[in-house]
Amino acid sequence: MVLVDTCGWIEWLTDGPLADAFRPHLEQTDALLVPTLVQYELAKWITRERDETLALEVIGLTQQSRVVALDTSLALGAAALALEHRLAMADAVIYATARAHDATVVTSDAHFEHLSGVTYLRQQTKPD
């Protein structure tokens, strides 16, 4: 199982520099885990940056995968991981969800870079 972080979805949606690296993970919907928190972040970002209709279409795409709601067990696990790794709430929930389901987090978010069970896709810096 793979959990693509919100930044990966946005990279793919905007055809950013790492879109091709995220694409294969997003296309394997039978092996893709989507926390409801990622759905929230996508809906908020897409509605703000584009429009609500596109946001609803993308949420529909996420529902072709295995959607995982935040429950008490995940919340407590996320709290422990946040304290252990100094993660923000959203990152901790995403990481806890992946760990609870034996999934690999695929992300370009540097907050995850040194965590186990993470495939970190480094953004290329432009030369000066």
Model-derived features with residue positions:
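Short, well-structured N-terminal submotif of metal-dependent ribonuclease cores
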Residues: 1-34, 46-57, 127-128
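A generic structural signal for short hydrophobic patches within well-formed alpha-helices
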Residues: 9-10, 39, 112-113
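A general structural signal for well-ordered alpha-helical segments in protein cores
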Residues: 19, 39, 55-58, 71, ...
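Structured helix-beta-strand junction loops
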Residues: 28-29, 61-65, 101
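General small-molecule cofactor/ligand-binding pocket signal
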Residues: 33, 68, 121
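Active-site neighborhoods of divalent-metal-dependent phosphate/nucleic-acid chemistry enzymes
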Residues: 67-108
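Acidic, PIN/NYN-like endoribonuclease modules and their adjacent C-terminal/linker elements
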Residues: 95-128
